[in-house]
Amino acid sequence: MSGGLAPSKSTVYVSNIPFSLTNSDMHKLCSKYGKVVKVTIVKDKHTRMSKGVAFVLFLDRESAYNCSRSLNNKQLFGRMVKASIAIDNGRAAEFIRKRNYTDKSKCYECGEEGHLSYACPKNLLGEREPPPKKEKKKKKKVQQPEEVEPEDSEEEGEDPALDSLSQAIAFQQARIEEEEKRRKQAAEDASQASTSEDTHKPRIKKSAYFSDEEELSD
């Protein structure tokens, strides 16, 4: 038989069950045949007492057929149980709808506080292991590293190679200027010395008398 969740094909109708049997008991009883999705025991609207009828929804059709064949005409706590594939009365969608029990402070089976239906003292088959809680996928906010904006600086460093080259050029230029300065200074000194010698050198004046004797003048 093909699988797939189809309430009209994978729901078992169980009747003549003990009135004291709870939803948890039916779940535990039918779980041996396959994955049980939901158990609903029909209760009186006013007294909330069981009417001895239950619907068990399985995950697949094969499990439902196995359960119906095994439980049909079986003695259960002194009562002859009847089981068959449930006939769809058009309310399958309503039946499959999951109920959310927001109040977790009290048991929905007996209404008492301090325990849940899985561990209710009224369960004839004892406690049932609660289904694993579905972990809610929390959207983790990926904390992106803060982008540190670089501070604007007016004093930007130059390339070391360019810096050393400029220093060499400047040094060479300074040497050239220094040499040129020295040359100019030496030329000026030489010019001044020559002028000074010419000034102090005695000049020979010819005698007015055209004599062979020369007169020295300062």
Curated annotation (Swiss-Prot):
Molecular function as annotated in GO: RNA binding; zinc ion binding
Bias (Acidic residues) ranges: 146-161
Key word S-adenosyl-L-methionine present: no
Top-level taxon: Eukaryota
Coiled coil: 161-196
Biased composition (Basic and acidic residues): 175-187
Subunit structure: Component of the U11/U12 snRNPs that are part of the U12-type spliceosome.
UniProt-recorded name of the protein: Zinc finger CCHC-type and RNA-binding motif-containing protein 1
Upper classification of the organism: Eukaryota, Metazoa, Chordata, Craniata, Vertebrata
